[in-house]
Curated annotation (Swiss-Prot):
Annotated GO MF terms: ATP binding; phosphoprotein phosphatase activity; phosphorelay sensor kinase activity
Domain HPt: 678-771
Functional note: Member of the two-component regulatory system ArcB/ArcA. Sensor-regulator protein for anaerobic repression of the arc modulon. Activates ArcA via a four-step phosphorelay. ArcB can also dephosphorylate ArcA by a reverse phosphorelay involving His-717 and Asp-576.
Gene that specifies this protein: arcB
Listed name of the protein: Aerobic respiration control sensor protein ArcB
Organism annotation: Escherichia coli (strain K12)
Amino acid sequence: MKQIRLLAQYYVDLMMKLGLVRFSMLLALALVVLAIVVQMAVTMVLHGQVESIDVIRSIFFGLLITPWAVYFLSVVVEQLEESRQRLSRLVQKLEEMRERDLSLNVQLKDNIAQLNQEIAVREKAEAELQETFGQLKIEIKEREETQIQLEQQSSFLRSFLDASPDLVFYRNEDKEFSGCNRAMELLTGKSEKQLVHLKPADVYSPEAAAKVIETDEKVFRHNVSLTYEQWLDYPDGRKACFEIRKVPYYDRVGKRHGLMGFGRDITERKRYQDALERASRDKTTFISTISHELRTPLNGIVGLSRILLDTELTAEQEKYLKTIHVSAVTLGNIFNDIIDMDKMERRKVQLDNQPVDFTSFLADLENLSALQAQQKGLRFNLEPTLPLPHQVITDGTRLRQILWNLISNAVKFTQQGQVTVRVRYDEGDMLHFEVEDSGIGIPQDELDKIFAMYYQVKDSHGGKPATGTGIGLAVSRRLAKNMGGDITVTSEQGKGSTFTLTIHAPSVAEEVDDAFDEDDMPLPALNVLLVEDIELNVIVARSVLEKLGNSVDVAMTGKAALEMFKPGEYDLVLLDIQLPDMTGLDISRELTKRYPREDLPPLVALTANVLKDKQEYLNAGMDDVLSKPLSVPALTAMIKKFWDTQDDEESTVTTEENSKSEALLDIPMLEQYLELVGPKLITDGLAVFEKMMPGYVSVLESNLTAQDKKGIVEEGHKIKGAAGSVGLRHLQQLGQQIQSPDLPAWEDNVGEWIEEMKEEWRHDVEVLKAWVAKATKK
């Protein structure tokens, strides 16, 4: 089949090559020849011979028929060939078209795939867009809700600020008001809209505006908060005191936009404070007045009974007089407790450390205590542990008061047996007293409470408190601590109690070369002008003065005293403070005005008013102060003070200063530090302590106000450690008390300890600085 197609193709190609006519003629000739040959072959086969007619007939018919047939066939073939060629061209075109279609199809497929991909991407993007739209709708909804909440919160905050009684305002960098609350509107009489863009000078009075502008400047200049008090006027003329706090405020990037201010009306607090101060002054005045009114007859009883005891008496008279004398002294000591309680509340307790004849002190203590014990049929024993110093530096009056409280309590709670006082003196300048009784004892659960103010031990029958004020032990312990010591107690119920008192009392070195004791030195005989208006006091004072060998002139009024006084006529002037026509202070001022100071003798106040500060008398021109009743030891000490040598005075002052330093400072530790590291380290540490202490005290006070027990204890512990590290013994002891909530009546006393620390720490620091400077010079 393939050969035929090739032959046919050859046929067509030849025809196209030779042309239709020539190919037709050639084909016709070939057919004629083929016809002749076939005719001859057939004739030969059929007839066995070939005749010429046969040949001619074949040629004739071949020539007649073959050209036309060949031509027709050639035309047909030509047409077919042309058709084939056209068809081939068409096929080729179709192939090309097919290829193009295939290419387009591939491209279309690619485009479709790409389109599908784009469609998928678009669908995804559309989905994401829809999701974004959904989220955007949610966010818009949330923002709308947030906006509503913010508006509600803003409205709530505005309502809250407007409902607040405190002032709230803010000003911009130009010091113009930017907004305020309702309270501020009421204060200024202007609405917020009216207040905006106004300056303080447009709102407040000139005086108030000046302070407002000054404080604003401080806030803007230093970028710190500021708190102060200021009186402001309401539109109706009312005045109110505000505690104002101003703070700078910033945006998120730290740019300052102005200040915010808050003001709290503390007018009522001020009134309350004023009322408290007035009440305190009234109480002090009352106690001062009652002191004078009670002590005047009491001093007469004590003085006259003491004078009468020196006269010849029967046994019964002596017994009665001793009872009167002891009762009056006891009453005086109870009153001293009340006075000291008031002084402690006002932080006015002052120690008068002077050389005290300790031998005479113990003798007086034994005599008076024995008198009291005899009233109840008790034995009194004084058991000193030798050696004891002849003289010590201490406040003899306070020490006598403490011991009298302890001994009086021992006698009060002892029905039978004895009261024993043991005394010893240790190295370190510490005096120890043990007051032991055989009385009812103290229950163990009350041992930690007996030193609390107003606490009274209950008896063992029915739980009733014992008689008394309940302040004696509390006052005594505070005095003991002020004197560098303490009071402790041990007791067994039914067997008695032992109170141990320790105080810091340096001994006075005795001069080996002295030919005689200072106490043996005779006192000078003085001409004394006694200014006193109460006859009983005159009798007591005159008796004491004349007993010491002095001559006495008496003036009953201030006018009489000024008329009687002549320079050089009197060696000593004793001035009562409360006279009918003027005060002793007025007399002192008048004398110092009339005469040169060198022409005046010592002017000494003689008063029963124990509340007055000694400095007040000294400022009025007085030289010293004696309390009533006038006692021989006090008068003797005063005379020696003005008629002894200057060297003795300087020695006394130096010893007194050392005593105060040792009570406040840890001298042994500081001396070791000074020797090891020198003064610079102590000074540097003290500077750090001085810088930190205000913060400590501030936190302590805030914790106390908030009743934060844990915070108080923690801050007390910090102060204790800091004070101990720089040798401030007194502050360390206070810190120890503050950090020890298990101490008896801690909650009742911690406020006083904190107040004491607040009042005293700067003084203690200055004492330490002075000690370091003095030790460095040495």
